[in-house]
Amino acid sequence: MATDLRTGGGRRGRPPGTSARELEVIALRLFTDHGFEDTTVERIAAAAGVSKRTFFRYFDSKADVLWHAFDGEVRALRAAFAAVPPQVPLMAAIRQVVVGVNRYRAEDVPELRTRMNLIGSVPALQSSAAIRYDSWERAISDFAATRVGQPADSLYPLTVGRATLAACRAAYDRWSARADADLTFYLDAALAALAAGFDPAAIRASAQTLSQHISRRAVT
């Protein structure tokens, strides 16, 4: 994974191979080392060996860098929902798709944790967070709407979308704070409880599964 995009000869503009992903890697490193507020677009561009103009070809602001992967997740959600067979129950489909889209390689987890910690701790990112979470929620609501034959902005699809988002944000927060289990286990436990209407027996079963996973990780 490239972290230095400088090219020789003092060439200005976009070096060969510069991409949104490469700028993202550099920006995340700078955010970690210097803080989000003290890292300017100029600093990111300089570290990448590109101009500010090139940076803005990829991102509208430095905050957008943190949401690059998230936007891809929303697209992946929609694509996965489109492939779900109609006989799969609604909440089972949502649980399956959300957990599947959030399977990360072990080497990508530290970066994901850094990203989520920044999003959760920097006040300046809250407005962009609201916009992105809304797009994620709409992906769920749109799928629910197609299943029940109602407009996406009607009560039931909106309820499904917002409840699912709340459950997943709780799972993300818990995972980010503890680092004791795979993210998918936290998501699966939260969505299983939601699908069961937070029935106490279902919650105990999900909690037991999560606890067993944590115990296995502790001895490996």
Regions found by a protein language model. Give the residues of each.
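Hydrophobic/aromatic residues within well-ordered alpha-helical segments
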Residues: 73, 132-136, 140, 190
